[in-house]
Design a protein with these regions (language model features):
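N-terminal intrinsically disordered, cationic/polar leader segments
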Residues: 21-23, 32, 40, 126-127, ...
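General beta-strand structural signal in soluble alpha/beta enzymes
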Residues: 12, 26, 48, 143-147, ...
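Divalent-metal-activated hydrolytic enzyme cores
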Residues: 119-176
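Conserved mixed alpha/beta catalytic, RNA-binding, or beta-rich assembly cores of soluble enzyme
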Residues: 26-82
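Short glycine-rich phosphate-binding loop at a beta-alpha junction
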Residues: 87-95
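Short acidic-glycine loop/turn motifs at beta-strand connectors
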Residues: 21, 40-44, 160-162
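A charged helix-plus-loop insertion that forms the helical arch/lid used to bind
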Residues: 104-125
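Phosphate-centric recognition/catalysis
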Residues: 1-4, 9-28
């Protein structure tokens, strides 16, 4: 599908969530945070979240996009409102960069498979990557593409009219 004549440009800050239609381009910049994009190829609807942490300690009345669990529930709410099913969406996941690679005392992330392991982990980027994979699978989605982990930050651009997402990684400076 061609780029629409009038494009709505959305920039997500940490904790933001947006779900829209074919006239929308969503951008964000990620460090240790993670973004999940979802796109419905027939209806040309979809969205992106930019979460900061896997889950909230305690409870609240409203869903908060700063937390992965709640961001996924925001997606599920929009999917229900559109009378669609999770299996109809194409999912891509980005981010989880190690922003302080020199301080990483344990090397690369170990696989984290449950809430207890995720809670116990001290590396927020590893926690965010693990919870993304876990929640996406739990709710019946399949990840079509991902760009996760590594060092430093990245910019993500997601076009809802086409479902395409682009990632631009920043060159990381190393102090000597």
């Amino acid at each position: 599908m061609q780029k629409p004549a009038h494009v709505i440009e959305i920039f997500l800050q940490p904790g933001d969530f947006y779900f829209g239609d074919k006239n929308t381009r969503i951008r964000t910049v990620l460090g240790s945070c993670v973004s999940i994009t979802m796109w419905h190829p027939k209806l040309h609807i979809g969205g992106m979240c930019h979460y900061m942490l896997p889950f909230r300690q305690g409870s609240a009345a409203e869903l908060d996009g700063r937390y992965a669990e709640e961001a996924l529930h925001l997606f599920l709410r929009e999917i229900r409102l559109a009378n669609t099913r999770p299996s109809e969406y194409r999912v891509k996941v980005f981010g989880g960069g190690d922003m302080f690679p020199g301080l990483n005392r344990r090397g690369r992330c170990e696989p984290l498979t449950n809430r207890e392991e995720i809670s116990a982990c001290r590396n927020v980027s590893c926690k965010n990557v693990a919870i993304a994979r876990s929640l996406v699978a739990l709710h019946g989605f399949k990840i079509e593409a991902e760009d996760l982990g590594g060092d430093g930050h990245r910019q993500v651009i997601f076009d809802i009219w086409s479902g395409h997402a682009w990632v631009r990684k920043a060159l990381t400076a190393v102090a000597c």
